[in-house]
Structures are given as structure tokens and as C-alpha cells.
Amino acid sequence: MNLNLIFKEQTLKFNKEEQETYLFLQQHNSDWANIFKEMILQGRDKVTQRLVTSMHRENLVKARTQSKKILSRDLIMLDISTTHILEIQFPQAKQTLYAPITGEHAFDRIDIEGPFYIKDDITNTITRVHHPNEILEYILIEAPDLKNAASDQFQQDLINSATNMTFAISYQALSMQHDSAPLFNIIENSEDSYLRSEQAVIEGHPLHPGAKLRKGLNALQTFLYSSEFNQPIKLKIVLIHSKLSRTMSLSKDYDTTVHQLFPDLIKQLENEFTPNFNFNDYQIMIVHPWQLDDVLYSDYQAEVDKKLIIEAKHTLDYYAGLSFRTLIPKYPAMSPHIKLSTNVHITGEIRTLSEQTTHNGPLMTRILNDILKKDGIFKSYASTIIDEVAGIHFYNEQDEADYQTERSEQLGTLFRKNIYQMIPQEVTPMIPSSLVATYPFNNESPIVTLIKRYQSAASLSDFESSAKSWVETYSKALLGLVIPLVTKYGIALEAHLQNAIATFRKDGLLDTMYIRDFEGLRIDKAQLNEMGYSTSHFHEKSRILTDSKTSVFNKAFYSTVQNHLGELILTISKASNDSNLERHMWYIVRDVLDNIFDQLVLSTHKSNQVNENRINEIKDTMFAPFIDYKCVTTMRLEDEAHHYTYIKVNNPLYRENN
């Protein structure tokens, strides 16, 4: 390697979004503003890390084939603490990227961390990467065909995501500066452990460059409405004329269900409106305050003027969940979790609520509950679902097709059962995303604390053996629900870290796994129909129904194995000095899966319902040497949010003697 390199210092400058956020913080809290300024590169680096990791694994612009590992001592002029560095060539741009490697993991994942450096191959000048858009610029030089409206938008997304990453981590540094306990202890001792766990996930999606995307919100709105800032939100109650709505409910009719969910609400509304107001002509909808201010009074003004949509004065006190548009009451309140439409660009999509979500949620709940009740295979596993009990969306049959869909999706409400109605008092409920979180003043993630607690309770000799037992218990519950559903019934739950709630016992082990949110699942329509469940009553625009067995398998595998278990196992392995621990934990997951498939074969013989060839086909795909990996950055640049792109990666579940 040519060591005649010149390091060039650069002046750090705020971009427009960072400047606006900084000015907001100066007015709001000068200490926070100073921390924001100090952490600006750290926030940007976290987004750069996601971009580089994904482009490498996806082999975007040959970032993987044109990369190699080098020793950090070959770049002694740089202050790099890791032993190895990932070097990625951009031959057309004549640039070389250097990314410090912190670990290598399953599914061909190389973990890296900032600061990152770029070398000009002509001048041999090295500079620190100041923003992820510098990397995007080189990607587009290598692949000019990707320079289009989608990449222009992605560039803005990276600016927004990096700004909000710094916004979030600087708030955490400010608000938790007097804490030092492990994060799990803080969550466990909170008045509402579940809500606190949602608020503890500061950095968002661990792999997506748009992890902190909040396009459509200014700094004040981001502060008011994002989970990490812990702010109470007053949800708006809207009365919508029944001729402008479509509803669905799990058991009783929509109005009765809503009255049961909010027993005091009707009385409060009756006190607000005149005695001769006819409530029977209207239905209750909950609307996010941002959606009310920015969308309802512009796109639905005609209906408001005609008193077909009426805003009530009464509000509901809720808090944002990690997903932004899912709102949660604070314990001891037992009112439902609510999923709402928001025209805000979050991660990779604008998060309105599709008609099929509010319509199909209760229908899907009914089918799943019937399966779980009647099929004995599920009784062996400590897992279940969270009911979606009722949904409503705006619908004006006079609107033309695309306009009708747009307006329907902008006003929708889905009610989900409150987790505290389902769990015993002595367990701690958490969103699994929080299991891998940390904060600046204690880097022990909750999953590590739980394993240490289990090690102590079970009097086990070492962390590694405790971790293996912990992973076995956890994966058995998670996979014991997901795998039989996709294999026997063709239902692929999207059981990633954010779409689950896990409860933990005092000894640190999982008690029960709860899977929620049926918007993104996929159903092999023919398979579910063959098992005796009709889909004729599903919404006519349903995207969840498919004829593609590959799409169904990938949905279940990516969300459950790659995302959910993959992140947990990676985090555990980083807490150990045993370089073989990660591999051994994947062996355990494979054993759990083998056992589930064995049980499926037995249940098939008893009920004579599932062709054994189907089980073998799924096993062959799941245990193949290479497995599909979803290319989140490639999809974003190609503007294919709903058409997934995959690349083959090494599969940790593969064994030579399958």
C-alpha cells in the first residue's frame, strides 16, 4: 500500500435542516443545542454506517466485489481503534472508502463504525467523511443510471435521517446524563415498562439508512410526535358521517366495540354536543393532531363545511410508539393501542393507513385466533397474537378511483388490544427492538442484562451457556408461531423486532411472545383456502394476498430470522469473547426449527391436511447454503418500495449434512 498519504482537514458545516434544528434547540434548551452541535458528526456517521453496510452486503455498485479487508496499521495516520478496516473501491469516481470493522456476522454482515475516511486516488489525499451523501455521490458516479428522481429523493432522505439521528441521540445524552444503571433496569423500574421500552429505541431501524426519516415534520413537530422525546400527545376525536365511512370489527359491530373500548367517551361527547345532535348518524374516528392540522382541514374542508366531519373538543392522552403512527396510552390506562394515518415519510414510505389495513385487521385476527384455538401444534409454544379489534376509514363513493384511494388512506383508525390486558402482573413487557438498545452512560443492552440475570437465577457457570439457553427459549416461542402458520396455512407474519411484544420473567427468561400488526403480512391465498379459510371477504385492494410462494416465504424468513433473531444473536455475540458463540446460537435456532418441522410432520399425519412435500420444500429453502436477503438501499434507489429486491447471502442455518 502506498503510504505517502496526505490527511486533509475539513471545516464542519451545518446543512439547512441541521441549522433549523439547531436554531429550534437554541430557543428551546441551550444545553441541548450545544450537545446537538457536538454530536453532529456522530449522528451523521450512524446513517453513513447504515448506508455503507447495506451497499456492501447488497453488492450495490459492486461494493462487495470491489472491497477487501486491510489492517488498520496500514493507515497509521488515521485514529482507528479497530484491527481491520473495510476498503471499498469506487473506480469511476477514483475514490477509496475506509470503514473501521467492528465485527463480521451471519448473513454476510460486516459491522462498521465511524469515523469513515475517503481517499482521492489521484492526489492520495485522505479526508474524513462528513455526511452520508458523500458516499451516495460516489454510488451515482459508479451507476449513473440510478441518478433520477428516486436518488434525488434519497439524497434528501439521508439529510433528514442524519439530522434526526443527531436530534435523537443528543436528547438521549441530555435527558439520561444522570443515569448509569443498565437500560433494562431503567425500563423494568418504569411506571410503564412497555412504553419506556418503545421510547428507549433511539436510533430506529438498525440497518436502514432512512432509520430516522421524518420528512414532512419540522423540528418542533418531530420533538412533539416522535417516541424518543417522550411527549404526551392529545389525539383528536372526529365524528364522521356514516355515509362517508367503512368499518370492520372483530366480534360486535364497530360502534359497540368503540363504546366498549372507551366507556366514558360517549358520555363526554354527549355533554359536548347539543341534545338534538344525532350520534346515530356518525361514527367515531381518532385522528393524529398532525394529520388533523396538515391534512384534514385542507383535503376534507368541503366535508367539514357540510358538518359531515366534525372535530370534537375532547381529546385522548397518548404517547408515540417506535413506529410513530402507533399510539399507546400510559399504564395504568387500559384503552387500546391505536394505529393512525400520518402523511409523514418514515423509514422508506409515507405512513398513511391503507383501506385494506383497517378492513383486514379484524378479519385476520378472527382467522388467526381460530387457527390457534383449533390446531394443537400451537399449544406447545409460548406465543400468540394481539387482536386488531376494529377499524374505520374515510370512504366517499363519489370520489374517482385514485382520489378515492388517497382520501381513504389519509383518514383511518385501527384499534388494537392493550398489551396490559393480556399479561400477568409480574412480567416485564418490552418491544424486542429495545433488547439491542443502549445509551451513552451504560453500554449494556437489555438482552445482555436478561441473560446475566438468567445465569444468576439458574446458577450457570458462564455467560455463553446461559445465552444459548436463553436463545433456545426465545426462538422456540417466536418460531413456534411463525413457522407452522407459514408452512401449514400460508400465512407469513411480519414478526420483526418492531412487530412483537415480549414479556420477561424475573429470572430473565422469556415468558410469552406476542406478535402484532397484520398490515405487512403475506398470505399464500391458495394454501389458506385449501386449509378451509375463505379470503373472499378480504378487501378488494388487498396486497397481502398473493400467489407467490417465494414472496410469502421471504416475508416470514426476513422479518423473523434475519431481522428479529439476527439482531438479537449479533448483539449477544458482541458481549462475549467467544468467537464461536454466534455460530453455536445459530445451531440452536436450527435445532429449534428442525423440531418444529418434525412436529409439523406428525400433525400432518394426524390431520392429513398438509402435503409433506410442502414441508420439505420450505425446509429445503430455509436450510439452503444461500438465502435471499432484502436489499433495502437498492430498493430505495430503484424506487421499488413494494417490489422487493433480494441478493443471495450465506445462510447460518445451513448444515452440510442437512
Please place each PLM-identified region on the residue numbering:
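Nucleotide/phosphate-binding site architecture used for ATP/NTP-dependent chemistry
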Residues: 2-476, 505-658
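Conserved catalytic-core segments centered on acid/base and nucleophilic motifs
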Residues: 470-506, 513-514
